[in-house]
Swiss-Prot record:
Record keywords: Cellulose biosynthesis
InterPro entries xrefs: BcsD_bac (IPR022798), Cellsynth_D_sf (IPR038470)
Domain of life: Bacteria
Residues spanning the signal sequence: none
UniProt-recorded name of the protein: Cellulose synthase operon protein D
Length: 156
């Protein structure tokens, strides 16, 4: 028997799974599920405690590099009581998602929410919202996802 050292490719499986989840559960349930998956992923590997946004950005990019999930830029928007999270190069699951190719975006909401609220001085009761209108998905070769993280009271 010949043993190959090739890594398995799960892209076909993930694409079929994405279609089935969307068809059977619907978009809202799918997004809730994927947010929970993101929170679970964040619990499996967490950044160290960071004292600055810049330091946190470096640590988050190191974690993202471990799983080849792109990179992030964090901006604290003091006047808006928010953090702008720009994630570049999100892996695609074919054309799945709304807009097409962004099926994994809700995972980022859970992932960043848990990572950021684990930091000193972070707010606990938060809302992560996606700014689809600001995402120019056709102008870049890789997916760009823009999220805003706000305290629940500032989001209403």
């Amino acid at each position: 028997m010949t043993t190959l050292n090739a890594k398995p490719d799960f892209s076909l499986f993930l694409q079929a799974l994405s279609w089935e989840i969307d068809d059977q559960a619907g978009i809202e349930v799918r997004n809730d599920l994927l947010r929970e998956v993101g929170r679970g992923m964040a619990g499996r590997f967490q950044p160290p405690l960071c004292n600055t946004i810049h330091q946190l950005q470096i640590e988050l990019n190191a974690l993202l590099a471990m799983i080849n999930w792109g990179y992030v830029k964090l901006d604290l928007l003091a006047e808006e009581q928010a953090m702008r999270i720009v994630h570049e190069d999100l892996p695609q699951v074919g054309s799945a998602g709304e807009p097409a190719g962004t099926w994994l975006a809700p995972v980022l909401e859970g992932l960043y929410g848990r990572w950021i609220t684990s930091q000193p001085g972070a707010f606990g009761d938060y809302v992560v919202t996606r700014d689809i209108d600001a995402e120019d998905l056709n102008s870049v070769p890789a997916q760009t996802i823009i999220l805003y993280m706000r305290t629940r009271s500032a989001a209403t």
